[in-house]
């Protein structure tokens, strides 16, 4: 099972997302179920390392957000056109 550490994201928009990516992080969103959508920030390098392992895209993952664990599956991954970078991930609650 995969565990990803995440932080709640307060700033929204293109400028905030660009600042995150420059700092080695990227935005993601968790939606689905009865709870409201949750915007989070993930560390790029640790997520890229996990994404290279078998089962990352198909298994149920655990997002650790402020000490709370959320079971999620990956819905969509957006990547940079030519750099080996993830720019955004959509998670759906499992």
Curated annotation (Swiss-Prot):
One Pfam family named in its UniProt record: Ribosomal_L25p
Family: Belongs to the bacterial ribosomal protein bL25 family.
Highest taxon in the source lineage: Bacteria
GO cellular component: cytosolic large ribosomal subunit
NCBIfam families for the chain: PRK05943.1
Biological processes per GO annotation: translation
Matching HAMAP family: Ribosomal_bL25
Record keywords, A-Z: Ribonucleoprotein, Ribosomal protein, RNA-binding, rRNA-binding
Name assigned to this protein: Large ribosomal subunit protein bL25
Role of this protein: This is one of the proteins that binds to the 5S RNA in the ribosome where it forms part of the central protuberance.
GO molecular function: 5S rRNA binding; structural constituent of ribosome
Subunit: Part of the 50S ribosomal subunit; part of the 5S rRNA/L5/L18/L25 subcomplex. Contacts the 5S rRNA. Binds to the 5S rRNA independently of L5 and L18.
InterPro entries membership: Rbsml_bL25/Gln-tRNA_synth_N (IPR020056), Ribosomal_bL25/Gln-tRNA_synth (IPR011035), Ribosomal_bL25_short (IPR020055), Ribosomal_L25_dom (IPR029751), Ribosomal_uL5_bac-type (IPR020930)
Classification via PANTHER family: RIBOSOMAL PROTEIN L25/GLN-TRNA SYNTHETASE, ANTI-CODON-BINDING DOMAIN-CONTAINING PROTEIN (PTHR33284), RIBOSOMAL PROTEIN L25_GLN-TRNA SYNTHETASE, ANTI-CODON-BINDING DOMAIN-CONTAINING PROTEIN (PTHR33284:SF1)
């Amino acid at each position: 099972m995969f565990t990803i550490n995440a932080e709640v994201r307060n700033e929204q928009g293109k400028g905030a997302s660009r600042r995150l990516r420059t700092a080695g992080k990227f935005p993601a969103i968790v939606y689905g179920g009865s709870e409201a959508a949750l915007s989070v920030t993930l560390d790029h390098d640790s997520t890229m390392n996990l994404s290279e392992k078998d089962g990352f895209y198909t298994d149920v993952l655990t997002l650790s957000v402020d000490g709370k664990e959320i079971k999620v599956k990956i819905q969509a991954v957006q990547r940079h056109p030519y750099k080996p970078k993830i720019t955004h991930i959509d998670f759906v609650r499992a």
